[in-house]
Amino acid sequence: LETDAIDPTRPRVLVTGASGFIGQALCRLLPAEDWDTRVLLRDAHRSDCLPAELQADVIVADLNSQTGLLKACADRDIVLHLAGQAHVAAVSAEVEVNPDVRAVTNLVAAASEQKVRRIVLLSSSLAHAAETRQGDITAYGEGKLAVEAELIAAAQKGQLEAVILRAVNVYGVGMKGKIASMISMIIRGSLPPLPLLSNRVSLVGSQDLARAIIQAATSAEAKGKTYTVTDGAAYSISEIESAIYAALGRQMPGWRAPPMILYAASALAGLFSRLGLRKGSISSRTYRNLTMDNLFDNAAICGDLGFNPRDNLYAVLPEIVESLVTPNS
């Protein structure tokens, strides 16, 4: 592969996962870039999620269809690969072949055959835990690390360029995950006040993550790099909880649950879930995540690509809360 930068004026890009949470955020920004955009959708009906001003070419195919992938990758410079399992609870350690690994293997083969220059892979900070064997080690993170390895191997063979973006937990309207669950439970009045927690976590806004993806697509500096993407802030779970109550216009209760109660409730919920007695995302892992630091540094992507996060959870939180209070508005 040549090493000069991809022409940033009007690159030809393919977006997978365009109808997902991050994909929709990206597609809202792409019209301003005026790129030649194509999206790969598994379901034609999901094209309703795309902004009309995107004016994208739509290919309907599955990531397991080599014929569809070859068509999607034809005459593309860059693939922005956002498709895949988005949440820890969706991944089982018992799956023999990770579908995300199979998908990226198929995508790399098609992209290489069609002379695609670069793949930008949206991964997760949980891949870092799997890689270092420190922190929150999950089957999900192991799977993301395996996906990264497939892409890196192809890049090392000279088939294409690879850029990997490891996102921390993402916030924004339409978000899912633990913070969204916490907001919903507070709205319903089913979550008692948490213990006073001193741990800090990194987060990133969906729009900032979309901007990082755009920057990574055409930067010569990004070639072969793996970046962690955060908004640069260190958030306290207790401060987030207080901000949720404020966004709801509610008074924060004057008492807090003892830490042991939180641990026991999380462990019991996890046991019920494993026994099939109750479905839910709460487990002893929830307790660990609520009580341990989970901080990441974004200095590399800021320094290399000039990434400059604009959003902050507390500024976006009222809109997120409103969307969960009135989800159909």
Predicted regions and their residues:
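Mid/C-terminal beta-alpha module of Rossmann-like enzyme folds, strongest
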Residues: 219-281, 298, 304, 311-314, ...
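Substrate-positioning beta->alpha
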Residues: 175-181, 195-217, 224-228
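Conserved Rossmann-fold NAD(P)-dependent oxidoreductase catalytic core, especially the SDR/UDP-sugar
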Residues: 102-142, 163
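N-terminal Rossmann NAD(P)H-binding glycine-rich loop of SDR-like oxidoreductase domains
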Residues: 13-33
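SDR active-site strand-loop-helix element
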Residues: 16, 40, 79-83, 119-125, ...
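Active-site Tyr-X1-5-Lys
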Residues: 138-163
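NAD(P)H-binding glycine-rich loop region in Rossmannoid oxidoreductase-like domains
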Residues: 56-102, 110, 125-134
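Flexible, glycine-rich beta-alpha linker
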Residues: 128-129, 163-181
